[in-house]
Amino acid sequence: MSRSTMLAHSAIPSSLIRMDLLSPWILTATAPKFLRLFAPATRRRSARSTIPSWSRSSSGKQAHHAWLSSITPCDGARSPWLARIPMAASSLQAQSPLGARRRVYQHLPEEADRLLKGRAQIVNVWRPLRGPVQDWPLAVMDCSTLAQAHIHPTKLYRNRFELRGETVSISHDESQRWYYLDGQQTDECTLIKIWDSKEGISGHMCAHCAFQHPNTPVDAPLRESVEVRCLVFYENQE
């Protein structure tokens, strides 16, 4: 089974192995590629640019629209003051239903009403530009461990008063399980579903963020990665 895996469903695929840690930063000598973590992460710097593109599958039943790319260099991310920022208050990412629908209207205004009558998703595609990743790897949460009480819709503003949209903030809880791909290579993409319009499913979104790994060598190359966010539509599903 490929290591490039969709990490947003209610159950972790068999290729992902969960491990309990003896203490927050003690890893076993025979640790597999996926490890359970309860450690803080810190904010990473990013430069964003819009990537407009539109394609349709040969069957005509699915369409997607890639609308955002985040080129992420991690230079400066090792500064001491950044290391004090907790995970839930820094770079943890997910998407609220209101914010997701707003994105559809923002990027596909003429087709939004029709597209949102069917099932819609937002899926992020994350890939390192330099590998293997040693500095600030990407971590994802097992969605089945995220309680609704820990999800908080959060307004986004520009210049303090101009409403830009809505995302979500997530409260930390000891029951949450986090995973990361150790030594991720440039040919290994991570697909992360951050929103799904279909109701009643357990894998509705996958929270994710970068974190400061305690075993990163001092001279490890700074991480560089690209992230593309895709709008996905299913015309024959509700």
UniProtKB/Swiss-Prot annotation:
GO molecular function: oxidoreductase activity
Coiled-coil stretches noted in the UniProt entry, renumbered to this chain: none
Annotated pathway: Mycotoxin biosynthesis
Assigned protein family: Belongs to the asaB hydroxylase/desaturase family.
Signal peptide boundaries: none
Function: Part of the gene cluster that mediates the biosynthesis of aspirochlorine (or antibiotic A30641), an unusual halogenated spiro compound with distinctive antifungal properties due to selective inhibition of protein biosynthesis, and which is also active against bacteria, viruses, and murine tumor cells. The non-ribosomal peptide synthetase (NRPS) aclP is responsible the formation of the diketopiperazine (DKP) core from the condensation of 2 phenylalanine residues.
Protein name, entry field: Aspirochlorine biosynthesis protein N
InterPro entries from the UniProt entry: AsaB-like
Highest taxon listed in the record's lineage: Eukaryota
Organism listed in the record: Aspergillus oryzae (strain ATCC 42149 / RIB 40) (Yellow koji mold)
